[in-house]
Amino acid sequence: MANPLYQKHIISINDLSRDDLNLVLATAAKLKANPQPELLKHKVIASCFFEASTRTRLSFETSMHRLGASVVGFSDSANTSLGKKGETLADTISVISTYVDAIVMRHPQEGAARLATEFSGNVPVLNAGDGSNQHPTQTLLDLFTIQETQGRLDNLHVAMVGDLKYGRTVHSLTQALAKFDGNRFYFIAPDALAMPQYILDMLDEKGIAWSLHSSIEEVIAEVDILYMTRVQKERLDPSEYANVKAQFVLRASDLHNAKANMKVLHPLPRVDEIATDVDKTPHAWYFQQAGNGIFARQALLALVLNRDLVL
């Protein structure tokens, strides 16, 4: 039976239903337990990073190689025809799509990945982050990590801390967890970096509980997941960045009242928002979370590029 993600564009987490998410996570678990080094051996995948990235690019490209795919692409658009000669994004994608079986793309402009789908023909586009909008594959690895550590994706208490305005990871993760039952959200951010109203409206429409808080201390005893984010210097003016960057910092001493199995997650890179003394606690799980990116992205690539996937 053909899988529902075959040749599907993955631009927003909302392109995936709850059943789709469960399929990706189940596939990720199978690939983690049983590697498939030749699954994509006849595929060529473009890795097109128009914006700087370390973890996402290396994670995606490692995933491609470990499934046996050939990888082409770039990590600096300044050295492409788009950057040097003024070629349009539409023309760039139109040409690349004639070479490859799938395109993984990061771009600083919101909506760029969706635009790319209009020019990629039958070649699926996977969004690796578009401005402050969406980061669906980060959400997949977040969900995989939450499911591994908590044993479920429903009836969770989840706190999100830091830059909730520009942090595309928290937008995608909130939308994804809203597809499951009984989850409750705690948003902890300075006013200038509050969760966008459209996310709050979505939660209200679904009847999902959420609340705003001014400190981690207010909620630490209640939560199963504490999702930290950095204040994104590249998206703020210098004076605003200086005012808010140190407002929410997690230290080991803040975790004394946490549940025994509460996990601290972070999409990385961190700057000052998680003190290094947290690393030694059993709550710190952000490096394992990053490692899970390999399996979540392998799962998505495998499903998008195989009509009938049997593992």
UniProtKB/Swiss-Prot annotation:
This is Aspartate carbamoyltransferase catalytic subunit. The keyword Nucleotidyltransferase does not apply. GO terms for cellular component: cytosol. NCBIfam families: asp_carb_tr, PRK00856.1. Heterododecamer (2C3:3R2) of six catalytic PyrB chains organized as two trimers (C3), and six regulatory PyrI chains organized as three dimers (R2). Carbamoyl phosphate binds at residues 55-56, 106, 135, 138, 268-269. Pathway: Pyrimidine metabolism; UMP biosynthesis via de novo pathway; (S)-dihydroorotate from bicarbonate: step 2/3. SUPFAM superfamilies: Aspartate/ornithine carbamoyltransferase. Belongs to the aspartate/ornithine carbamoyltransferase superfamily. ATCase family. L-aspartate binds at residues 85, 168, 230. It catalyses: carbamoyl phosphate + L-aspartate = N-carbamoyl-L-aspartate + phosphate + H(+). Pfam families: OTCace (PF00185), OTCace_N (PF02729). Its EC number is 2.1.3.2. Catalyzes the condensation of carbamoyl phosphate and aspartate to form carbamoyl aspartate and inorganic phosphate, the committed step in the de novo pyrimidine nucleotide biosynthesis pathway. GO terms for biological process: 'de novo' pyrimidine nucleobase biosynthetic process; 'de novo' UMP biosynthetic process; amino acid metabolic process. It is an enzyme of class 2 (transferase). Transmembrane segments: none annotated. One of its GO terms (molecular function) is amino acid binding.
